[in-house]
Amino acid sequence: MKMEYAIRSWEIPSLPIVGANARFPVRRIFCVGRNYVEHQKEMGGDGREQPFFFLKSEFSLVPKGGTVHYPAKTSNYHYETELVVGLAKGGRRIDAKRANEHIYGYAVGLDMTRRDLQQWGKDHGRPWDFGKNFDESAPCSELVPAAKIGHPSKGAIWLNVNGKQRQKADLSDMIWSVPEQIAYLSEHYTLEPGDVIFTGTPAGVGPVKPGDELLAGIDGVGELKVKLAPAL
């Protein structure tokens, strides 16, 4: 029997998959903070602290990038280039040594951030939601199956703004590896198929404005193009 709803329903957010007609349904978006040493330093951290995570709505996704509108209520809008992981299997208390078995594939993502609102939250002991979780705050490339590329743990991760390089690092510079992140998250949540993890950004984050063109890439994974449009 078909389910009836009291209001109009909505489509499940999803990502295209390289070489496939099927799409990857997105359930939740977890994001890790300060996971590259140099970025940790530029944000005021020091050392291998416990990983910490925040959530973005799955409806913040912008599949395959394209046009992203400058958000409201900010004058300090930042990019953060990240390796994105999509899970095919869930579980609790996942062993880091077997965590790769849970991964469907990888993508290039941007954790777009209203830095001034994030900083206000930090300064006042408030949540970061207004700074991190808002419309169009998670542009993401097509997902590449791990069956095709394996599990990248090294390779360049970079971002150019208007043709000028702003971020450049290597995936091996991560403080917490992808398997370690999955294992840690699974101690606090029951992970599910369709969960997505943004695995942290390297140093070089900075502001952008309407008209700017962003090109992000990760060796062996792909590229993501975004153009900033004026606020709606």
Feature-to-residue mapping (PLM):
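Catalytic-pocket segment enriched in acidic/His residues
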Residues: 2-23, 39, 45-47, 115-232
